[in-house]
Structures are given as C-alpha cells and as structure tokens.
Amino acid sequence: MIPQRAILLALLMLTFSTSGCFGEVDVEEEVPQPSVWNFERPELTWYHFPDAVDAWGNDSAELSGRNIPMPAEGTYYSIGMSTFEPTMGITESDTLFMSSYGNGPSGSTAVVACNLIGITTLDYSCENTYDPLLPIANSNDPYIYVDPWTSRIMKFDMHALLGMTVEWSDNDGASWNGPSVATQFYSVQDHQTIASSNMQAALYPTTWMFCINGNAPHPLCSSSQDGGATWGPETSGAPVTCSSGGLSAHLVGSIDGNFYRGNKGCTGEGYSVFRTTNAGISWTEHPLPTEITGTADTWNAEEAQVEVDSAGNVHAMWNGLDNKPYWSYSRDQGETWSNATMIAPPINLSGTGFPVVVAGDEGTVAFGYVGETAGEDETWNAYLTYTTDAFNETPLLTTVQLNGENDPIDIEEDCGYNRCGGLGDFLDIRVDAYGRTWFSLSHNLADHGIFGTFNIGPSLRGDSLTMLQEMPVGGQATL
C-alpha cells in the first residue's frame, strides 16, 4: 500500500509541471505600419498605376523609395495675351519665355518673358522682350527655343512656306542678333522645329539643328556650328529611303550630343524615334512599341514626342488609336524600348490630344496633354501627369487637372484632335532648375496663353524626393 504522503507529493509535482501548458499564452501585438497615404487628396488630383488603375489609399502595393505618393495640385498662370501653337523655354535667370503670335512690334511674334518662378503672390509680370530695330513681321509658324546649356534664346520664323529666319538673344531678350537666313532654295519650308545638343561645335559650345517639312518623303534637317549664325545644307533627317512623311514632332538635343525626333515610321506605319549621333550626317530609325496601341488618326497624328533626362535616357509619348496617351522609355539611346504604358488617370477620359513630354533628372518624367471628359457636353481640360520613379516595374503616376471644373480651356467639338484655336499644331513643356514642370498652352475660351504647372508637388530634380516651394493658385484670377 502506497503511503498517503507519497500520493500527495506526486500530485503536487504534477501540478507544477503542467501549469505552464494551461496558462495564458502571450500573443505578440501586430503594430500597424504607417500609411504612405497620409495627406488629403485634392479634388482634381489622381494617383494611379498604368492603364488608369486607381491607386489612392492602396497600402498593399508596397510603395517605397522614390515610388511613393506626394501631395500635388495643378494650376495655371496667364501671360496676359493670346498665343498660337506656343513654344517656350527657361533661361538661367529663372525667366520663363513663351511665343505669342502677332503680338510683337509690327505684327511680329512676341517673345514674352514672365517672372513666375518662385512667386509667392499673384503679383507677377509678363511682357514682350522682342523689340529690335527692324522686327521680322511675317511669321506663319512662330517658334522659340532656349538652349539649356547656354541660355541663348532662338526665335525661328517661317515665312509663307518660302523661307525661314533665325534671331537670337544672349541677355534674356534685352537685345537681338540676326536675322540669319535658314533656308535652301530647293525646298519649301514648313512646320519647323529647332533644338541644341551638348555637342561642342566648331564656333559655339553647343551644336544647333532644325528640321522641316519640305520637298522630301521625310523631314529635312540642317545644323549650325556657330550658334545659329550660319546653317549647313538641308539634308535627310531620316534614313534616305525613309517614307515617313515630312511632319515631325519637336526635335530634342541630349546631354550626350545626340539629337532625337519622333514621327511616323519609315513604312508609314507605327511611330518611330529617329536619332543622329553626328549632327545630322546620318540618322537611324528606332520603332516604338505601337503594335498594341496603334496610332492616332487625327490632325496631329504625327505627334510622337520625345525627350531625354539628365542622364541621356529617352522618353517617348504618343496617342494610340483609342486617342489615349502612351509612354515608353529607352535606356540605351533608343535601341530598345519598354512596353507601352497608358498614362491617363482613372476619370473616364474619352480621348486626349496635343501630347508633350519632358524629363528632369534620371528616372523622372512628366507629360502634358489636353483631354475630353466623357459625357453629353464637349469639355476639354488640361492635364499634367508625372512619375518620380520612371523605371519602376509598376510606376506610380500622379495626374493633376490644371483648370477648374467650371473653367474649361475649350468646348469645341473634337478640339484635341484638330487644329483648335491657340493650340495650333503643337504645345511645349520644360522643367526648371528647381524641378518644377511648366506647360505652355492656350486657354482658348479666354484667348490667353497660359503656363500650366504644379503649385504643389515634388521636384523632378535631385537624388532624393523633395517638395517644391508652394506657389499661389492662379487659374481664372490671372486671365
């Protein structure tokens, strides 16, 4: 017989050995991660992924690094006068310039200077700076360009298809040189575009080039080795067997000395980017990925725009057959291209037009365009879309509408698909030294040239993401 004392001792030991098995189990509390969506979204700002997929509030997307949302808002500022197919530039003095057709002396193209960069109130000024002793009065295609390396302002006028003249200023328009003649007798001159590249020329720090729609099955181009004072012969701006048609989007020069331009492919199908590495002596064709997107069937169907960032990466933008805006990039000077990305916001746009593209530092890019909202009323608004992490597999896109809901830039039927009021044939876009995007276009209902921009948003310059200095809201108050 087992003694009672031994039984009690055994039970006591069993109790101690099993007490931990039936006690309360400590559960580690899950600490919620802070959301990147920690700010309010303005009514006319949209955060989205490619193909108009809404991204707002999506914490499962693992947004990080440069691919994160930043507060953004868009607005515009009037130049106080009309414009037609406005081109623009920015000088090292932080002055914005826009062409203004017919508003200069003797009916010339005005070169309008605005001190908008860095404003804290709407007390800004815009005034014509083109006032030479003998102004060039007749201009069928007004065009200005600012050399991003030297700040030389180039005024480039076409005269009734018969010839072109070039004038330039090295002091923000205080004085003008020229005109020089930029014309060859063997071709008509139409739809010109001009740019400089960071290639040392014989008599000037940069090489200049222009291209035209002339008497050839593709654009003709000419280069200058002395900053635009004299010009070489107009030669093929594409492979000599190319049949792309002569209408070209804006020419652009690169940090590596290359020039690029975009238009229809040499077969007449799709869009291509054309590149010269030797100031126009020879050109190569680099087809864009338009097999799925198709190409626009509109007045400005040649508008396959191209731009380069500070590292020489190439960005292209075009309208597809569905009239939506598409983007592709190349990191090897156009040899290969990323898949096409549809960049419109998730707001049911029925179509877009007048595309322009600009790039800041490596991996940043912004797009300007006009768009029609679906509905019974024909309403055209202006938009800017950007990404700060362009080479991400799923880049976050941010789009702002520049005009208010009750302030459309036009209400004409199919405005974005045709030559429409002051929008003309094309628009223009640049990034200033601080990383703010500026988009030159026309507010057709008010008949004013306007600069569209982000009054709130991140900089497209610098290694890290920083916010721009906030600017006052412009809009109708500036018309």
List each language-model region with its residue ranges.
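Secretory targeting signatures
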Residues: 1-35, 477-479
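Extracellular, repeat-based ectodomains that mediate carbohydrate processing or recognition
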Residues: 30-479
